[in-house]
């Protein structure tokens, strides 16, 4: 489960994922919902943003299936393909769009800091990802470090610098994890 809420406006997001790994392979199904409140929502008339509304043609949910594969422990590159198959990811004519996202991740460590390099692409036209053809939409470098607070508690901090060449945009995400 993952969620977020912007302080300055009405946007909020709740994502629920069920995943299973077997050997080098993994599968996942994720329910994304990020429509937030109707107030100030430019899509409020097109979808029913009630979290518990699950009609495929009017829901604000996006349901995605994903497959991933990790090459090996010695070369830990992972490859994932995710496709929206149900919900709000629609073409102009109302048909399902099947927007897809492919991501390569390579974890490594430098001086006790866990790092992860990411390349993400949208392989074809997708209104959801805002691209009309193949596009690189995610170049990122993430870092994680456990900060020892006491002999029995460490606080995992993380930072991620994200570039989106397709939209000429960038983001910085900072946070901590509670276990």
Regions found by a protein language model. Give the residues of each.
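Transmembrane beta-strand segments that form the barrel wall of outer-membrane beta-barrel proteins
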Residues: 1-7, 27-35, 50, 76-87, ...
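Short loop/turn motifs that connect adjacent beta-strands in outer-membrane beta-barrel proteins
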Residues: 10, 19, 28, 72-77, ...
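Residues that define the transmembrane beta-barrel architecture of outer-membrane proteins
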Residues: 10-14, 21, 59-63, 94-102, ...
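Outer-membrane beta-barrel "beta-signal"
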Residues: 106-108, 141, 168-179
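A C-terminal functional module that forms or caps the active site or interfaces directly
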Residues: 116, 122-144, 148
